[in-house]
């Protein structure tokens, strides 16, 4: 049986560049990735450099709330 708080949780990473520009006419949406993080090793918000298909470059993707 599972315990109350799981150590490994699923998080959603969203492109900070797409959100900051306000979805202008050039971009068709916001890039999102789904990944997992270990709550004990990374208690703060996760930020990774991933490829954004809407910006056509590698940008910082930050963790968002569900």
Swiss-Prot record:
SUPFAM superfamilies xref list: Zn-binding ribosomal proteins
Subcellular location: Plastid, Chloroplast
Primary localization class, coarse: plastid
Gene Ontology molecular function terms on file: structural constituent of ribosome
Keywords tagged on the record: Chloroplast, Plastid, Ribonucleoprotein, Ribosomal protein
Disulfide bonds: none
One record GO biological process: translation
Gene Ontology annotations for the cellular component aspect, listed alphabetically: chloroplast; ribonucleoprotein complex; ribosome
PANTHER family attached to this UniProt entry: 50S RIBOSOMAL PROTEIN L33, CHLOROPLASTIC, LARGE RIBOSOMAL SUBUNIT PROTEIN BL33C
Family from the record: Belongs to the bacterial ribosomal protein bL33 family.
Protein name listed in UniProt: Large ribosomal subunit protein bL33c
Provenance organism: Eucalyptus globulus subsp. globulus (Tasmanian blue gum)
